Regions:
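NAD(P)H dinucleotide-binding glycine-rich loop of Rossmann-like/cofactor-binding domains
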Residues: 89, 114-186
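Glycine-rich phosphate-binding loop and adjacent beta-alpha segment
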Residues: 269-334
Length: 346
């Protein structure tokens, strides 16, 4: 086997000298793997929410066109990085082959079922056939292969829950795990996109961390997700609003917090133009955590400057130590969460 680079630079075709994620094209030839790679037989792609929403809109909801767009992305780039959003997703698959340099260094063995916890935007991918598209949960079943680099992180699918349930939670594992690090007892926390997958997990974790002296406010988009979040009972206040309309949302948060605003705002939406809502609803010394892949650095930075806000803004890193374990544990802890996730995603 050829010797590979830890970060997968050996797979970059164009431009040379960059890492696989920003590369325009990477090598997705799976006939031969490098000595530090893991070959995966792919079962399901879990497309990033912002990416899938964009593809679905471009395709007008037509499944055949969604498939064509996805195949075109992979054919052109050797990976699934949405050219509009720049985001990818992650995958579920079975370990097919392990490079010789990783023998004795990894706890994986051939036949293990895993979820990759690195983005599809940097993962060499070959799609042989698209078998099923589940638009409601952003998942696509395929026949195909993928490569996990030596630096790539993963989670073994646990024995105590269905694989699609675990995959759905692991897709957004960074959000609740980062919430656990950020939220302190007594904090007022606003979660934008609270009725979605990452939003529900964050609401549960935020309430656990903020405690009885804290307050969790959930902003949802649809009537359906609002009703669901109210029934879950994780939030002190839940309301439906258009997160792209900052003034209206600001007025509502002023009312709910008696003008104190949020200590922490966590943005989980999959649409653009919600930066100012996040910033305006957060107190001057507070924190805005942008987990959304639809976030614009320019809009957030210039927007905060434009309204004289001194908030600390954090780019949502999808990885934090122990994030997979933390997130799966939430589904074990909360029967309500597990029931909803099972109904929606499993």
């Amino acid at each position: 086997m050829k010797k590979g680079n830890k970060y997968g630079v050996h797979r970059v075709i164009e431009p040379k000298g960059v890492l696989p994620q920003p590369a325009n094209k990477i090598d997705n030839n799976m006939d031969e793997i490098y000595d530090n790679e893991i070959l995966i037989d792919v079962i399901t792609l879990n497309i990033d929410s912002a990416s899938f929403t964009q593809i679905e809109e471009q395709a007008g909801g037509d499944e055949q066109k969604i498939a064509e767009i996805m195949l075109g992305i992979v054919e052109k780039q050797g990976k699934h990085r949405n050219p509009v959003t720049g985001s990818g997703g992650m995958l579920l698959g079975i370990v097919e082959k392990i490079g010789t340099a990783l023998e004795g260094k990894t706890d994986l063995k051939v036949g293990d079922k895993i979820a990759t916890l690195v983005s599809l935007s940097l993962t060499p991918l070959r799609i042989d056939k698209i078998k099923a598209i589940r638009k409601d949960i952003d998942q696509v079943d395929i026949d195909g292969k993928a490569i996990l680099f030596e630096s790539g992180i993963y989670a073994k699918i646990p024995a105590d829950m269905p694989e699609k349930l675990a995959l759905s939670a692991l897709d957004v594992a960074g959000a609740p795990a980062q919430t656990a690090k950020l939220v302190k007892p007594g904090d007022t926390v606003l979660i934008i996109g609270a009725g979605g997958k990452s939003g529900m997990l964050c609401c549960y974790e935020a309430k656990k961390r903020a405690g009885v002296t804290g307050k969790v406010i959930g902003l949802c988009h649809s009537e359906k997700s609002t009703k669901r979040l109210i029934e879950l009972g994780f939030c002190d206040h839940v309301f439906a609003a258009d997160a792209t309309q900052p003034v209206a949302v600001l007025e509502k948060i002023e009312e709910l917090t008696n003008g104190q605003m949020a200590d922490i705002t966590i943005n989980n939406v999959n649409i653009t133009d919600t930066e100012m809502t996040s910033i305006l609803c957060t107190k001057d010394t507070g924190i805005v955590y942008f987990f959304s892949m639809a976030t614009s650095f320019t809009k957030a930075a210039l927007g905060a400057e434009g309204v004289g806000s001194d908030v600390t803004m954090i780019v949502g890193n999808g990885y934090t130590r122990g994030h997979a374990e933390i997130t799966l544990e939430l589904l074990r802890e909360s029967d309500k969460l597990r029931k909803v996730f099972t109904e929606l995603y499993a």
